[in-house]
Amino acid sequence: MNQDLRSAIGNRHWIALCLGLVALGLCLLGWFLDPRQFFIAYLFGELVWLGVALGSMGFLMMHYLTGGMWGWPTRRMLEAASKTLPLLGLTFIPIFFGLHYLYPWAMPVQVAADQVLQHKHPYLSPFWFVVKACIFFAIWSVIAVLLNRWSRQQDSTHDVAPLIRIRKWSGPGLVLYPLTVTFTYVDWIMSLEPDWYSTMFPILICIGQMLSGLTFVILLLFWLGPRSSLSAVTGKENFHHLGSLVFAFTMMWAYLAFGQLLIIWSGDLPHEISWYLHRVAGSWHAVVAFLVLFHFFGPFLILLSRQVKRSRRALAIIAGVVFAAHIVDVWWMIEPSFYQHGIHISWQNFTALLGIGGVWLFFFTRNLESKSLVPLNDPRFALAITA
């Protein structure tokens, strides 16, 4: 047990677990009261925390390949977040029982009346949805478990063989990550409106996930740093590098989001443009304005300042804003598929987000406690802190 971290966190992880279980209990009540809204909200909550875990795994593999200074104080957090992927595979299971509430292709009546759905039925069907989800969760879980296992082996030996294995497999892992996300998010989000398609959408999802994983660890690093041994290896330069990454990924997210909009809007094809029309109709345009301001323009303009990137508090505030904006972005991708005339907010959105999040934070913290907060016996780490 990491006593350093345990003294900093105290019993907060147990509080998170209790709150999460209470929220999940309320979700169960929502299942009986309004099953359709329950599955909409549950899908939203699941994909928010899955995005944090997958984005963290992506950054973890990126750090193993590059060895950047930004990764040393965050590596354990990235490892702990990625190790929750098997848990998120289990929490995804309830969605299998509500496909007919979420997806038109799971409703035989709609399939019979829609030629597009009939054409896509060999790929979009309940059976293959479950099979593909199980396969891809297995792939993610295997990658995460191996990365964590080899990292633990490196901690216990001066032999660099585990580090070589990690670097050897991180390259293919970074290829598998966007490929698997492409297939899964076509099923999980794009097929909520199965007539719609966009080749840019999956990579936009990947960038959003990595941004959510990055901002999450920045928030944790800001809160935990002064309370733990991380303070000795976390300085202004580290925060500067992390701030530069937030800046870069914010720009990439905006570039892809605008590029997708521009291509679809200029094409003006009914099957493509309808997705955006549903998301700007009525009061939904206020959510678009929120995302433009807080997911791009605000962070972009503020992070132009070198002083902001080097300030722990300022960067943590920006990270918190971007993380919150990403949650709204996931909600905006899902909710208008069902409520196309204006904003619809249900209490089940909050209980699902908090319920899955509370359980996730508990296991994340337990994973984080199981190892030293700084890497051991990694020769690159020694070089980084003396540079």
Where are these regions (language model features)?
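Transmembrane-helix bundle segments that line or gate the permeation/cavity pathway
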Residues: 46-156, 173
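N-terminal regions that are enriched for targeting/export leaders
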Residues: 1-53, 121, 365, 385-387
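Hydrophobic cores of alpha-helical transmembrane segments in multi-pass inner/ER membrane proteins
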Residues: 53-61, 89-95, 133-145, 207-222, ...
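Central hydrophobic cores of alpha-helical transmembrane segments
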Residues: 313-324
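Membrane-interface transmembrane-helix boundary segments in multi-pass integral membrane proteins
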Residues: 201-205, 271-292, 311, 339-366
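Long, contiguous internal "core" modules enriched in hydrophobic/ aromatic residues
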Residues: 7-29, 120-291, 381
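Short, highly charged, low-complexity non-transmembrane loops/tails of multi-pass membrane proteins
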Residues: 373-387
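Membrane-interface capping segments at transmembrane-helix boundaries
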Residues: 145-155, 363-377
